[in-house]
Amino acid sequence: MSGENVEVARGLFPPGRELDGPLIAGHPDMVRDLFEPLIAENFSVTFVAAGLTTTNRGPAAMSEATRDYMDAFSEHCSVFDRHIDGGDVVVALGRQHGRAHHGGEFDEETGLVFFFDPNGKLARIQGYQRWREALEAAGLSE
């Protein structure tokens, strides 16, 4: 099942593809339709931005979390280059860059941890601002 989990993570966050956060946040129905068949009943997403942590739950969690996260930025793009297989957990590592409403331009590490249930459904996505934090949360190392 772990290889399938990596493919799910890569399908949602393709390696090397620049993801325009505000554009994605502006299409909540598209995001919900993409995620809904892949998620467990208790699905949640947690992101941290500018010291604010938000957690959203349910079928609309990813679109709501993306919208909430993007509220901190006037411009934002992410690119994930690596997807690390940890069995029931997959870590996507990349960079995010753009301009925050408060604090100016940034270019920094970012990591997402995808937690899967025993049936291969996404149970949770947790965002981290440092690769090390994402790897530790997944019980992995580089």
Q: What role is predicted for each listed range?
A:
Residues 1-142:
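C-terminal and inter-domain tail/linker signature
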